[in-house]
Amino acid sequence: TFVATFLLIIPNVAFANVVKSFRVWPSPDETRVVIDLGSEADYSYFSLSGPDRLVVDMKDTTMQAKLPVTVSDSPVLKLVRKSSPPEKGTYRLVFELKKNVQAELFKLSPTPGGQYGHRLVIDLPHGKKTATTAAKPSKPATTSKDMSTVQRAQEVLIVIDPGHGGEDPGSIGPSRRKYEKDAVLSISRKLAAQLDATPGIKTRMTRTGDYFVNLNRRVAFARENDAHLLISVHADAFTSPQPRGGSVFVLNTRRANTEIARWVENHEKQSELLGGSGNAFVTNTKDRNVNQTLLDLQFSHSQKEGYKLATEILGEMGRVAHLHNTKPINTSLAVLRSPQIPSVLVETGFISNPTEEKLLFQRAHQDKLAQAISKAVVKYLKDNPPEGTVFSPSSKPMVHIVKRGESLSVIANKYGTNSKALMAENKLKSTSLAVGQ
């Protein structure tokens, strides 16, 4: 009997990686494309013109996601499609652009909580920074001897920062369907509306939709807008479902002093990675000692004021919600590190707690939280008025010209005062007003 053994050699066609999905997040400043992968990306890229395109070659990769992807709400990106690869085993992606842009590509590792695996991120800047236009203070009105000596002092500008967004969901509740980014955006919108309705206050939001904003960009946004305060809104989380209640974090350059504070700090670093590279601020190396002294003074002031604001917020939040900490917590989160601007990070509750997860998405509870924070901010401003603002006693009087349909009580309400005070200030003998007075 003759036995023959044959070895069948089959070429290895298994791919090392797979594209699972595409996610596109247009924001006011840039369009972010996130490619979800099975493993770490091995890629190269280049740009083409006539028409403008970005070409990305991914080695040993196959496609599981559906292509093409049409993008309708981005000012720079039209379409993502496949193209003929330069060699076998490489998958070529073509990003059809509306104009020439300088793309930034970087890889992200899986998130600790397992929400996302390996990713390749492509940032396509829009060019003009539409979301970061500085808020210009109102020009003083012409001095007048008319009725309302009510030249306008500067309004207090408050930047509200809804945490996370877009590619970064923040913490995810035990139901696995509720994201921190959505709850805090809703609360932030309500807070902005509450504060904007207060005479002498106006707000700006670091994001107004579901898109990611780099942590350093959030701080820069507050600086560019000459903000008097920065309030970052988040929902807390922990590895067990038991912790519950709100907290307020304030700046401290020392290491976080509780286990939960350390967890939040480490969790935020994952969000910081989503923005690629960059430093919070760079000092002038030629005047290092002077800069250090100035920074120390600025940090000392912003830290002290931030602590005052945090204390007020905790006092009001405690009336409408359970508190996890009744005193401000010291930490060194990036969003709190602006030396010029008193900043606080408000944890509105634990999304990892099943009961609080439900509360954080209830409109009535969101309203209560927004009202509590707003009330605390107004109280802080009255007790600690920023110089040159309408809250400051030393502010120059404002001029108001009476318009048709306005009564003394309407004007008084607009400026947060009462009719009697306006009559005394303007030496009025009657509540009757004339248009143009």
Regions found by a protein language model. Name each.
Residues 37-39, 58-60, 97-99, 123-126, ...:
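Flexible glycine-/small-residue-rich
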Residues 43, 56, 178, 285-390, ...:
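Active-site-adjacent mobile loop/cap segments within catalytic or ligand-binding domains
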